[in-house]
Structure formats: structure tokens, C-alpha cells
């Protein structure tokens, strides 16, 4: 059977059940959830005018020279197209230097989104969780930056910090060039999907954590998003319920202290930005409890949170739920919400 996103992500999160075993044993034994009969990747969102091209006209490498913790031999780029011919998805692997792809609206209104695609930290799904985001929100006047972040299992050290380093650095680089991009740096938020939702949640709860040595003046700026959208997110590597099912998703063999540190649901404070969540109740890969626990923790911390939980939708739908699904309205609801919450 052709490899698809849910197979790979399922293997990634399934490995978390074996967190106490060696990395090699985890890799060999990680179960892959069976796909529902007839399942196909979601149809790419293509409004009038067609989708923007990849790569974008403006691509900005985030790190001058080698990124932090680089291996002796950098990963080699390995983009692939996946899924049936009518529903192809572009996946990025082999990320040697994190980069942001800039998508500018015809009439910028000053708002901006850092879009963080998912992929189980094994690839970056830039089609339905990057290009589609740019197309939709550009039409509303929002400048979109799609983050292609380094993948932990491609040789970086410490592996579990590489994505957060990239997310922090992206926020700072964007803010350092706000005038050039015609955005208000105070209106820059983040929108993350699945593993990218984990990274977005990690960013909003660890934006001030020192995870790399400053490299230039941009690193004096804040990495804190003004707001966050978390779409079917993994919100903790160890969940409040005690489940360790996501423990190996980011990097095998992490210590309990590192697992706690990279479990953003446990780190929500009065400083955490407002959040908007979307999660299908029937998601077979990232359980709805991830979002429910986030809401409970946000309420305990007194932080605003809003959510949409369609009964049906599965995982990885991006902006592509069927029109007769009430959850298909989430991009419009989120767009309205962000205008009231800093965007």
C-alpha cells in the first residue's frame, strides 16, 4: 500500500507506547494504525485563481552558516509527492537549514501568520497545512510565512530542541523585517497543525526559553506569538491522563525531564497567548483529549480559549473538510477570532 501521511504519523505516535525501550526497538515495533476502508488524503483546497506555487518567490534561510547542533553531514533535500494522482501532497524531508516561505497578500492589512505544518516530525506537509493556509489567509489581507523546520531524526543535537529553535528564530527574523514585509510585529501569530500544532504550542509556552545562542540582532527580539491556532495538536508528550503514547514522537530516548519540558499543556501560565483549537472527535491518531486537556489547563490559568470539535473529520484535514461538515467553517471562524485576539 502506498505510504501516506496517516501511516507515517501513526508510526511516529505509536512508537511513544514503547518509550521505555531502546530507540531501535521502538522503530522496529511501533504499530501502524489501520486506515479506514476507502480513505484518501484530503483534496487540496484550490479557490479561484489557483494555489500559490512552491517554493514561494521569497524564501528566507533562518540560520547564517550551519544551524545549531548540525551533524557533520547535513541532510540532503528529499521532497516527495504522495497520495493518489488527484490528491497529491508535497512532503519535505532532508531539511539542512530551516526556512520560511513568504506569501504576501495583494492588500496587506498588517496581520501575519507563521504557519507550521505537521508530519509527525518525520516530514513537513507543506501542501494542505502551508500552501492552503497562504491561499486562504492572503485573500483576507494576512501575510503568511510557512515554516519548513528541521526534523529531529535527521542528525541534529539535541534532536528534541531543533524544531523549537527554528520556530523561535522564525518569529524573531520575521519581526526584524516587519517593515519590509509590511506587517505589524505585534500582530504576528502562529497556526500549527498536528506535530506542527505541538511545535506551535511549545512556542507559545516556551517563547522565552533559551534554546540556542544568539546569532545576530534579530535574536534580541521577542519570539512570543500574539495568538495561536492549534489544529488537531499534540499538546503534550506525556499527557495529564498519564498516557505516554506521544513520548517518542519528537525524539526517541528523551529523559522524563525533557518530556515534561516539551509538554506545553503542562506549562500554560498567565503569560500564554489566547488559543483557538480545532479537533475532530473521531481523530484516530491524535486523541481529542489533547485539546480537552489544553482547554482545562488554559481555563485554570485564566487564559482565553475557543474551540471547534466536529464529530467527524479524522486527522490531517487541514482546510479541506467537506462543505457539509460544520467543521469546514473553521478557517472563517478562526479569521474572525484572530481579529479579536491580536491579529
Region annotations inferred by a language model:
Residues 1-16:
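N-terminal secretory signal peptides and thylakoid transit peptides that target proteins
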Residues 80-87, 217, 226, 233-267, ...:
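Mobile cap/lid helix-loop segments that gate and shape the active-site cleft of serine hydrolases
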Residues 110-118:
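Short beta-strand element of the alpha/beta-hydrolase
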Residues 125-127, 132-133, 147-185, 320-327:
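Catalytic nucleophile-loop/oxyanion-hole region of alpha/beta-hydrolase
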Residues 172-242:
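Primarily recognizes the serine-hydrolase "nucleophile elbow" in alpha/beta-hydrolase
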Residues 285-290:
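Conserved alpha/beta-hydrolase "acid-adjacent" motif
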Residues 292-343:
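C-terminal catalytic histidine-bearing segment of alpha/beta-hydrolase fold enzymes
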Amino acid at each position: 500500500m502506498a505510504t501516506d501521511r496517516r501511516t507515517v504519523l501513526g508510526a511516529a505516535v505509536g512508537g511513544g507506547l514503547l518509550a521505555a525501550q531502546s530507540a531501535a526497538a521502538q522503530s522496529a515495533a511501533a504499530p501502524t494504525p489501520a486506515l479506514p476502508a476507502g480513505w484518501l488524503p484530503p483534496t487540496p483546497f484550490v479557490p479561484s485563481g489557483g494555489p500559490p506555487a512552491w517554493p514561494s518567490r521569497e524564501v528566507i534561510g533562518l540560520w547564517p552558516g550551519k544551524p545549531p547542533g548540525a551533524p557533520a553531514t547535513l541532510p540532503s533535500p528529499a521532497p516527495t509527492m504522495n497520495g493518489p494522482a488527484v490528491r497529491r501532497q508535497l512532503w519535505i524531508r532532508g531539511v539542512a537549514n530551516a526556512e520560511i516561505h513568504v506569501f504576501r497578500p495583494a492588500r496587506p492589512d498588517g496581520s501575519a501568520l507563521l504557519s507550521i505544518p505537521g508530519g509527525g516530525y518525520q516530514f513537513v506537509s507543506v501542501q494542505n497545512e502551508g500552501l492552503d493556509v497562504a491561499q486562504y489567509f492572503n485573500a483576507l489581507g494576512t501575510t503568511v510565512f510557512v515554516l519548513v523546520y528541521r526534523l529531529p531524526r535527521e542528525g541534529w543535537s539535541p534532536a528534541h530542541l531543533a524544531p523549537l529553535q527554528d520556530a523561535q528564530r522564525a518569529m524573531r527574523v520575521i519581526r526584524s523585517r516587519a517593515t519590509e514585509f509590511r506587517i505589524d510585529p505585534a500582530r504576528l501569530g502562529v497556526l500549527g497543525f498536528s506535530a506542527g500544532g505541538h511545535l506551535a504550542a511549545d512556542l507559545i509556552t516556551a517563547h522565552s526559553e533559551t534554546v540556542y545562542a544568539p546569532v545576530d540582532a534579530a535574536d534580541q527580539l521577542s519570539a512570543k506569538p500574539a495568538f495561536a491556532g492549534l489544529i488537531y495538536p499534540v499538546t503534550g508528550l506525556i499527557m495529564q491522563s498519564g498516557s505516554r503514547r506521544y513520548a517518542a514522537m519528537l525524539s526517541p530516548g528523551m529523559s522524563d525531564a525533557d518530556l515534561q519540558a516539551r509538554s506545553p499543556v503542562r506549562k500554560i501560565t498567565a503569560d500564554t497567548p489566547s488559543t483557538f483549537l480545532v479537533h475532530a472527535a473521531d481523530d484516530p491518531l491524535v486523541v481529542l483529549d489533547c485539546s480537552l486537556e489544553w482547554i482545562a489547563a488554559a481555563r485554570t490559568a485564566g487564559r482565553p480559549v475557543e474551540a471547534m470539535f466536529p464529530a467527524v473529520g479524522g486527522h490531517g484535514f487541514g482546510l479541506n473538510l467537506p462543505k457539509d461538515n460544520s467543521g469546514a467553517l473553521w478557517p472563517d471562524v478562526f479569521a474572525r477570532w484572530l481579529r479579536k485576539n491580536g491579529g
